[in-house]
From Swiss-Prot:
GO terms for molecular function: structural constituent of ribosome. GO terms for biological process: translation. Coiled coil: none annotated. One of its GO terms (cellular component) is ribonucleoprotein complex. Signal peptide: none annotated. The keyword Ribonucleoprotein applies. Belongs to the bacterial ribosomal protein bL28 family. NCBIfam families: L28. The lineage of its organism: Bacteria, Pseudomonadati, Bacteroidota, Bacteroidia, Bacteroidales. Keywords: Ribonucleoprotein, Ribosomal protein. This is Large ribosomal subunit protein bL28.
Length: 79
């Protein structure tokens, strides 16, 4: 399971930890990602998605059908 949101396409970023003495060490900023099941009324089935918190807000705002269509158009989801 890759750490990529299937709705927004968000993935981990690389940055620096900066100490008080301003030394920089590499670190990873991970996505707030979780697996959630949704009931897709148009297809009459359950769909399991790896989504971020921002992806969940997108689904709440647009609806599941519109969010999945948008993600498929952008290439984040193979549906």
């Amino acid at each position: 399971m890759s750490k990529i949101c299937q709705i927004t396409g968000k993935r981990a970023m690389v940055g620096n930890n900066v100490s008080h003495s301003k030394r920089r060490t590499k670190r990873k900023f991970n996505v707030n990602l979780f697996t959630k099941k949704f009931y897709w009324v148009e297809q009459d089935c359950w769909v399991s998605l790896n989504i971020s918190a921002a992806g969940l807000r997108t689904i709440n705002k647009l609806g599941l059908d519109a969010a999945i269509k948008m993600a498929a158009e952008k290439g984040y989801l193979n549906a």
